[in-house]
Regions:
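Internal intein/HINT superfamily modules and their associated LAGLIDADG
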Residues: 1-274
Length: 274
């Protein structure tokens, strides 16, 4: 059984908020049997999250052992809890400290899965991954004598794409309601303020230009009006705590922006709700 505890066991610089099922053959097979009931669209949704804020790791330990893990790291505990409940994994939080640039780091929550459970999850999300496809293939190849099946790349139906896009946007995108106040003059020459009706806006920002362009193309084929892709040149900024020898200037990556407003944003929101 999963043991849930807020007593928070310490694990190095991390704390375990909720203990999941240990990765053994018996436990993994139990979880996999439950996961087999999940729909393909749910797997596409999960793939979107993994492409956005997830990780597929095949790093080895300092002793040369495989440390294969699939997981996700966020500041939103609720989402991490959902993944942990789904995959019967632990919820871990890093102890609060300060980032290298000197600013306070927000508490991050992590859940990850390994063993046969991770292999099964990787098999299911691989057909829907876009950004981390190679990571998934490398992950599966790390299992001895494991046959890699060929799957079509980026050949998703509209329903599969929208499920993936929903997960990806929950990781990388934002919806917001904009309220605009304008200065007007009436027929008597009197000045007054006019509050325009609230407007729904959506934006997706990422450093990967190709994935932004792919999303734009797919959405336009589905009838959404997309403005041209926005671009912001990566600027230079300080990195490292003030007053230390590690203080230096680094250049941030260029950013690409997908934007929808008004009715297009509302329709997109309704399309993503299911």
């Amino acid at each position: 059984n999963i043991i849930s505890s807020e007593s928070e066991k310490k694990k190095g610089k991390e704390m375990i908020l909720k203990q999941g099922l240990k990765s053994t053959k018996e436990n993994d097979e139990k979880v996999i049997s439950k996961l087999k009931n999940m729909s393909d669209l749910t797997w596409a949704y999960i793939a979107g999250w993994i492409d956005g804020d997830g990780f597929i790791s095949t790093l080895k330990t300092k002793h040369g052992h495989n440390a294969r893990r699939i997981g996700i790291k966020l500041i939103d505990r609720e989402i991490i809890e959902w993944f942990a409940d789904l995959f019967h994994t632990s919820v871990i939080t890093a102890t609060e400290d300060r980032r290298e640039d000197g600013y306070n780091r927000k508490t991050q929550y992590i859940t990850g899965v390994s063993g046969l459970r991770a292999r099964y999850i990787c098999e299911k999300i691989r057909p829907y991954l876009i950004e981390k496809t190679k990571n998934a293939e490398k992950f599966l190849r790390s299992f001895k004598d494991y046959p890699i099946k060929t799957v079509p790349y980026m050949q998703h139906t509209d329903e599969e794409f929208m499920a993936w896009f929903t997960g990806y946007c929950e990781a990388e995108g934002t919806f917001n309601i904009s309220k605009t106040c304008k200065n007007k003059i009436n027929s008597k020459g009197e000045h007054y303020k006019y509050m325009a009706p609230p407007e729904v806006k959506f934006e997706l920002v990422n450093t990967n230009e190709s994935i932004i362009r792919y999303c734009k193309t797919r959405l336009e084929k589905m009838g959404f009006f997309i403005q041209k892709i926005g671009f912001r040149k990566g600027r230079h900024t300080f990195f490292g705590a003030k007053g230390t020898k590690d203080r230096r200037i680094v250049k941030k990556k260029d950013l690409f922006r997908l934007f929808l407003a008004s009715s297009s944003a509302q329709i997109l929101y309704r399309s993503m709700l299911p």
